[in-house]
């Protein structure tokens, strides 16, 4: 599990390779990832938007920006958490993702929280140690 905390908001990510949705012959690998956002702060916050940087095993990057996550802009009171699962395809057997969520406090302040960088590994990926 990967973890980051920004302003008392914890984000954890657990990636999972999905062989049933992947095809080595077609050059397609697919992962799901489950994100849990926990508000340990004293103020209610709302997730407004997301920003992802997806990097495949060849170093090609794709940026994704959009409102909310999985069609929602969850509101998290102190002590509450929100969990969702999404997916990502790559044209290589490995890669990684990183990003941020734009949050808004009950007082209207907007700020970014870190989504920890996480590795997308498949059994077909070659591990290289530098």
UniProtKB/Swiss-Prot annotation:
Domain ApaG: 3-127
Name of the featured protein: Protein ApaG
Superkingdom of source: Bacteria
Encoding gene (name): apaG
BP GO annotations: error-free translesion synthesis
Pfam family, one: DUF525
Organism whose genome encodes this protein: Bradyrhizobium sp. (strain ORS 278)
HAMAP family referenced in this protein's UniProt entry, alphabetically: ApaG (MF_00791)
Matches recorded under PROSITE patterns: APAG
């Amino acid at each position: 599990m990967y973890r980051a905390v920004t302003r008392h908001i914890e984000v954890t990510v657990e990636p999972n390779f999905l062989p049933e949705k992947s095809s080595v012959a077609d050059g397609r690998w697919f992962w799901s990832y489950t994100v849990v956002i926990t508000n340990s702060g004293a103020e209610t916050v709302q997730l407004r938007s997301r920003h992802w940087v997806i990097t495949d095993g060849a170093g090609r990057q794709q940026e994704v920006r959009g409102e909310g996550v999985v069609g929602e802009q969850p509101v998290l009171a102190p002590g509450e958490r929100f969990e969702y699962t999404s997916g990502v395809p790559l044209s290589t057997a490995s890669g990684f993702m990183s990003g941020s969520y734009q949050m808004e406090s009950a007082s209207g302040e907007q700020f970014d929280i870190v989504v920890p960088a996480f590795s997308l590994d498949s059994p077909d990926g070659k591990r290289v140690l530098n």
